[in-house]
Amino acid sequence: MHVTVVSPEQAVFDGSADAIVAPAYDGQVGILPGHAPFLTLLGVGVLQVRQGSASTRFRVAGGFLQVVGGGGGGETVRIVADRVDAS
């Protein structure tokens, strides 16, 4: 699935991922290929973008996460955070 992570200042990640773990406003959410279309508000915490055995981490605060095009692995995950820092 294709993932973009942006803040008001910059795009911090644009690439493919096997899994995402994100801090939603009411608890953590996991996104895998084949996930249904989805929209949630982000809370404060660590966002993990997993690519095989590697994991890229960002500290995020506020914003939203959207999954579009759910189904056969062609999803796009958009993460627009009010604040993003490398973790």
Residue ranges, per PLM feature:
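Compact, glycine-rich, soluble single-domain proteins
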Residues: 2-87
